[in-house]
Amino acid sequence: MPRLRLGMMLVFVAALGLSSIGRVLAQASVQTQPIDPRGQEITLPAKPIVYASGASTWDKAFDSLLEAFKTVRAYLDKAGIQPTGAAMTIYTSIDDTGFNFQAAIPVAEPPKTPPPADLAVGTSPGGKALKFVHRGSFESTVTTYDEISHFVEEKQLDSKDVLIEEYTTDLLSTPEDKLVINIFVPIN
């Protein structure tokens, strides 16, 4: 199964109210590292970003995201623009066949010259959010998302229809079991 599919499938499953997937995965011997299930309430700062929009099926998720990030990074390098933060995926919609996303990299200010047509400049989502930290493989994000879903349901929080993953470790060079991903759940 592709590396991101399991994590993002859980978001879809949680949206349907099927929160028992964590127990099923535990029985399937998926190795995970526990997170702090409380989440940390923060105010997410809106930042200028350069991003590539895309859509992907679940079986091509990881490759689609990597290609999008490579495109953004190549533009920033060519334009001499330094990133001001970690790469992030902003999931704008999710369903059983795939998802729509923005593969974004924060910058200090919008570029003076517009990027090529396959890229855009915008602002990352800002405002009240819950921050969770996932440590481990993409496959183990399923349990992390299950814990997040339980927390949001238990606290009866009204989450927005967007999800953000911020990659604090390099997706290409970090051993998969050493990945660190900040997961932001914007709330109303």
Predicted regions and their residues:
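A solvent-exposed interaction/effector surface
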Residues: 2-6, 17-188
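Sec-dependent N-terminal signal peptides
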Residues: 7-13
